[in-house]
């Protein structure tokens, strides 16, 4: 790849962001935000798809496909502990799964 100005800026900003999140407290806060955003997305998808019952099966299939692809990428590859993107995506998936689990409890009661 050519060393253009844009390529250099993106590379430097990525390194600065990676350096910024090396701090354990920032990493924990990013993980917590990812989990809460996943929880919000799962609840929003469940309630939106539940309003129009035609999309229930399609949304469930997409969420299942997303979760399985994240699992395959995260666990098969042997992700290192320092891989922030994989860790944040896996925690987002946990938030989505947990929110759907709680939505099922709400519907069952």
UniProtKB/Swiss-Prot annotation:
It holds the Pfam family DUF565. InterPro entries: Uncharacterised_Ycf20. It comes from the Bacteria. Belongs to the ycf20 family. This is Ycf20-like protein.
